Amino acid sequence: MPVSAGAGLRAPHFPALLDGQARFRWVEVHSENYLYGGPARAALLAARAHQPVSLHGVGLGLGNADGLDADHARAIAALADAVEPAAVSEHLCFNRSGARVVNDLLPLPYARESLDLVAANIGRAQDILKRPLLIENIATYIDCRALVDPREAIPEGAFLTALARRTGCGILLDLNNLYVNSINHGVTVESVLADIDPRCVHEIHLAGYSEEDGLLIDTHSRPVHAPVWALYEAYIAAHGARPTLIEWDAELPPVQVLLQEADRAQAILDRLAAPHAAEACHAPA
């Protein structure tokens, strides 16, 4: 995966990319928009000829208690075989309970039981995909800590690291989500990052949030805010360069604004760090 700053590619920006008006270092698309062929898949394959593409899923439901949706995983695998992406990523969440499916990223309680469940689902998904997944931490609006027996609780950062070490997946570290959660739930970003093994972090996401009645919402509809840029600079300075993506999914700006955000991230990468030397993400001896 390119150790550089890319951007999320959404349908309105495809023409600018394909006719050469916009030059991205690499792009990420939402897997579910391209699963079943048609003009959208054709446009994605054309974009793939211009630069690396990463697939980012929102519907695999790795935290679903009744197991992995194998049909959905097979559809993503077929897409990945066609696109040959630089990476395939998903969110650490659930989206189904029995027959009821929710079109959202629902938070998990971080506990031993859920760790076992998610690890099993990731393992099966990776077997179907025949490639490792990157797993992203999500923004949450319900504090699940009260639902967990303190004797079984696992801090979020330790949960992510344990998943990576157990399954061989990587961590997609969303710094905007960490910041949103720190304000909404009173958990410091520093305490979460202290539990995340940087060797397991293969990619970083940056995005903008909105504020409603004192609550921060991960809307992906704004430029990256100053506190998130500060977190990013500090992380890169401490741990080295990582592939970095600017997410912008709502109230889309002109493509040049999106590219300016990516250029700002690239300038930080160029200024603060040499490329990160890949290391194995193993449990400490």
UniProtKB/Swiss-Prot annotation:
Pfam families tied to this protein: MbnB_TglH_ChrH (PF05114)
Signal peptide residue numbers: none
Taxon lineage: Bacteria, Pseudomonadati, Pseudomonadota, Betaproteobacteria, Burkholderiales
Ranges in a coiled coil: none
HAMAP family: UPF0276 (MF_00697)
Keyword entries, A-Z: Plasmid
Family of the protein in this entry: Belongs to the UPF0276 family.
Acetylation keyword on record: no
Name assigned to this protein: UPF0276 protein RSp1035
Entries under SUPFAM superfamilies matching the protein: Xylose isomerase-like
Domain of life, source organism: Bacteria
UniProt entry tagged with the keyword NAD: no
Listed transmembrane segments: none
